[in-house]
């Protein structure tokens, strides 16, 4: 099982400071700009964590509000020291890098920061003397600058910002730079001249960059240990250059905090475009022969000719082996030792028996699929989404044997690619199967909370129907409301947002209403009142109104009334909202339109029982039409006794206000009383109930009074039924809430009916016997 170890003190303090910046580390200058308090000095370990955690909070926690001038806290290296920071996506703009230009950064990772322009290229020069590692992966606009040359007024009126490619920037002066990632950049960047000043590159990533002549790579043949050419359109000329990079044969190099293993990645996305180049037996043999000490190789996505593999009949028998001499891939038999990693995703080779590598990415089994998700998540969402889709099939059809690893990898992918439709669809679908009851015992509270967070992030960031449906279904795998309480307000807001469009997808509507109903069941009144103010009552009434117009009584209709029943329980404000927004008209219309829908009737009457418990609202129920409807429902046999019981409960509270409050001529009060007595006497005292009382307070207030004996009798019958049928639940509740002395007083009352007193004695007897049977007599 996953560990439920608490967060470190460092993590807790970092989180608190970031959520309370102007109350902890800084203050607001001119009510806008953050400034560090003058008496604070923060070392690099703390500064790096603050920045990196800030990025994580902004990208992963939608409830966290970013601060426009956050990076200004780190503008002065005399009080703050930054060394290694990882920034991503639209969070970072030119002015943010400009704010920290005086820092001696050693490591700067900028991933998919599309708001960065050529202004940031100039800022990068500020770090040239200290930078060892730089990633500009996916920063597609950083080599563009605005240009409004004279004589193009007409063009600039249409497009005031004319963008031109920067061609004169180079890495001149970046003398310490060893690691560089320029992957996923736009076409046209003059890579050769850009990189020429770098003398000692150890790792280079040119993913997606097309260059017909790769000869310039040989300038680092004595230093380059890791080369990534993912999605580069290769040719035999490229291969001839690659095999000259003899340092790719080297073993692990230590450079500062980094360990670089010799790695070659010539993989591709097989769906992105047509590639003429095919990996032949000759090419693979050449790579192994010339780069025999490679520790890691990725050839995923390539069309590989069949003569590369050993035939099934010639394969070594016995257990799968990583020994090169037994390799099912013929050219790899020349390896001196097994590879640490071999990327074979979406190639035929991954399905072979003997693969000379300790870790393989592929699509053959769960292990290979998880390795693929792990290897490609950060920079290759197109591959990651397909790998997660394979994991989805494994979790759905078979059994996931590495559950915790799978969950963590999917969570990471969803956080990393919050706005990628394919990953959000496949990831949310995989989470549904990975969190179901079969796997529940293996998951810690912390891990399940991480799942909830990432699901809510998906719902918040992506309005696509499939994502919304998958996320709602995944939430159904959790104990509601208990496991969602730490995000209670947020999840309700999201669900109500889903339900607001009345033409919403039917399946999502049904799931969302079910979740809303579960969320307001068994929670305290403060929660219910807060959700009511968020528009819960109004949203449910609109759904009901829409179903009425369609003349449809389905699960959405029934769940909506059930949700209203739950949210109005002991919450007068929500009851009043129900009345104010035409709830009684909808009740009458539903009753008329769907006379045979028993569960619907029960839910509606349960809700009206809650309304009737509020003294200030009861006058609104005192109309001839409403009283007649309630009286007629006393004789209903729908859903056992439930509809009749709830109708009698509504009338009992109305009767409790006395004859002077009876403001209608028809039906007469005495007539209704007689019908109530008859209904109560017709009920089976041993009836099993479809009801759940959290408190007896509304019932108990009907006991110590003589103004309405029938109300008193209904309350006593309710208690007798519940303590008889469900003694373990309701005897302790009645004793706890002081019901016993009230029942004893009732027995002494002259106005109480004899049958009511007799029933009260039986309730007292049941509870007394229960207390004696459950008394702890151990010593």
UniProtKB/Swiss-Prot annotation:
Chain's role: Serves as substrate adapter subunit in the E3 ubiquitin ligase complex ZYG11B-CUL2-Elongin BC. Acts redudantly with ZYG11B to target substrates bearing N-terminal glycine degrons for proteasomal degradation. Involved in the clearance of proteolytic fragments generated by caspase cleavage during apoptosis since N-terminal glycine degrons are strongly enriched at caspase cleavage sites. Also important in the quality control of protein N-myristoylation in which N-terminal glycine degrons are conditionally exposed after a failure of N-myristoylation.
Domain of life of the native organism: Eukaryota
UniProt keyword list: Acetylation, Leucine-rich repeat, Repeat, Ubl conjugation pathway
Subunit structure: Interacts with the ELOC-ELOB/Elongin BC complex. Part of an E3 ubiquitin ligase complex including ZER1, CUL2 and Elongin BC.
Chain positions of ARM repeats: 440-480, 524-569, 571-613, 615-656, 727-769
Gene it is expressed from: Zer1
Signal peptide: none
LRR repeat residues: 226-245, 246-281, 291-315
Alphabetical list of InterPro entries matching this protein: ARM-like (IPR011989), ARM-type_fold (IPR016024), Armadillo (IPR000225), LRR_dom_sf (IPR032675), LRR_Zer-1 (IPR056845), ZER1-like_C (IPR055142), Zyg-11_UBL_adapter (IPR051341)
One annotated GO biological process: positive regulation of proteasomal ubiquitin-dependent protein catabolic process
GO cellular component terms, semicolon-separated: Cul2-RING ubiquitin ligase complex
Family listed: Belongs to the zyg-11 family.
UniProt name for this protein: Protein zer-1 homolog
């Amino acid at each position: 099982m996953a560990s439920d170890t608490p967060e470190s003190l460092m993590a807790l303090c970092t989180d608190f400071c970031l959520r309370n910046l102007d109350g902890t580390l800084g203050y607001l200058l001119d009510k806008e700009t953050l400034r560090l308090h003058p008496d604070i000095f923060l070392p690099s370990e703390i500064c790096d964590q603050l920045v990196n955690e800030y990025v994580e909070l902004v990208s992963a926690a939608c409830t966290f509000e970013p601060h426009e001038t956050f990076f200004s806290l780190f503008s002065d290296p005399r009080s703050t020291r930054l060394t290694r920071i990882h920034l991503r996506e639209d969070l970072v703009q030119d002015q943010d890098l400009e704010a920290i230009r005086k820092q001696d950064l050693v490591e700067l990772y900028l991933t998919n920061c599309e708001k960065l322009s050529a202004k940031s290229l100039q800022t990068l020069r500020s770090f040239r003397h200290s930078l060892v590692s730089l990633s500009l992966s996916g920063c597609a606009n950083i080599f563009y600058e605005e240009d409004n040359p004279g004589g193009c007024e007409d063009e600039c009126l249409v497009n005031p910002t004319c963008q031109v490619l920067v061609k004169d920037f180079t890495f001149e002066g970046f003398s310490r730079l060893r690691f560089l990632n320029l992957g996923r950049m736009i076409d046209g960047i003059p890579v050769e001249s850009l990189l020429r000043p770098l003398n000692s590159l150890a790792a280079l990533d040119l993913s997606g960059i097309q260059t017909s002549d790769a000869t310039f790579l040989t300038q680092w043949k004595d230093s380059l240990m890791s080369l990534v050419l993912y999605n580069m359109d290769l040719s035999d000329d490229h291969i001839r250059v690659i095999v000259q990079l003899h340092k790719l044969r080297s073993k692990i190099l230590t450079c500062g905090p980094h360990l670089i293993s010799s790695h070659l990645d010539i993989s591709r996305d097989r769906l992105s475009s047509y590639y003429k180049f095919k990996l032949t037996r000759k090419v693979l043999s050449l790579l192994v022969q010339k780069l025999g000490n490679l520790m890691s190789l990725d050839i995923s996505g390539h069309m590989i000719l069949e003569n590369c593999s050993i035939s099934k009949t010639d394969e070594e028998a016995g257990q799968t082996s990583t020994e090169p001499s037994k390799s099912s891939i013929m050219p790899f038999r020349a390896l001196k030792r097994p590879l640490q990693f071999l990327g074979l995703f979406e190639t035929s080779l991954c399905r072979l028996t003997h693969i000379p590598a300790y870790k393989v990415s592929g699509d053959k089994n769960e292990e290979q699929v998880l390795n693929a998700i792990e290897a490609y998540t950060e920079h290759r969402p197109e591959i990651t989404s397909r790998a997660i889709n394979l994991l989805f099939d494994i979790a759905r059809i078979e059994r996931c044997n590495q559950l915790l690893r799978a969950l963590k990898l999917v969570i990471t992918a969803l956080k990393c690619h919050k706005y990628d439709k394919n990953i959000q669809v496949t990831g949310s679908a995989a989470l549904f199967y990975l969190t179901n009851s079969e796997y529940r015992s293996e998951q810690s509270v912390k891990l399940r909370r991480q799942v909830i967070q990432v699901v809510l992030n998906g719902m918040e960031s992506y309005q696509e129907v499939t994502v919304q449906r998958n996320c709602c279904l995944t939430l159904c795998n959790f104990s509601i409301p208990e496991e969602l309480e730490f995000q209670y307000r947020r999840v309700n807001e999201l669900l109500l947002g889903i339900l607001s469009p009345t033409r919403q997808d039917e399946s999502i509507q049904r799931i969302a209403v079910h979740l809303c109903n579960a969320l307001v069941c068994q929670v305290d009144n403060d929660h219910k009142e807060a959700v009511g103010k968020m528009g819960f009552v109004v949203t449910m009434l609109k759904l009901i109104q829409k179903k009425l117009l369609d003349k449809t009584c389905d699960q959405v209709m029934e769940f909506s009334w059930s949700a209203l029943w739950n949210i109005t329980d002991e919450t007068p404000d929500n009851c009043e909202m129900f009345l104010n927004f035409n709830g009684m008209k909808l009740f009458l219309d539903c009753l008329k339109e769907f006379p045979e829908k028993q569960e619907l009737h029960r839910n509606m009457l349960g809700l009206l029982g809650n309304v009737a418990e509020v003294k200030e609202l009861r006058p609104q129920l005192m109309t001839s039409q409403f009283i007649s409807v309630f009286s007629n429902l006393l004789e209903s046999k729908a859903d056992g006794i439930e509809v009749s019981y709830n109708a009698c409960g509504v009338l009992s509270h109305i009767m409790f206000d006395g004859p002077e409050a009876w403001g209608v001529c028809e039906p007469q009060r005495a007539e209704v009383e007689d019908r109530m007595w008859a209904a109560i006497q017709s009920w089976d005292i041993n009836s099993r109930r479809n009801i759940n009382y959290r408190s007896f307070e509304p019932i108990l207030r009907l006991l110590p009074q003589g103004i309405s004996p029938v109300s008193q009798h209904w309350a006593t019958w309710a208690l007798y039924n519940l303590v008889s049928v469900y003694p373990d639940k309701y005897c302790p509740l009645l004793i706890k809430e002081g019901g016993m002395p009230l029942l004893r007083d009732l027995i002494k009352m002259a106005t109480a009916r004899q049958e009511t007193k007799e029933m009260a004695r039986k309730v007292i007897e049941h509870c007394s016997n229960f207390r004696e049977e459950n008394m702890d007599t151990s010593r």
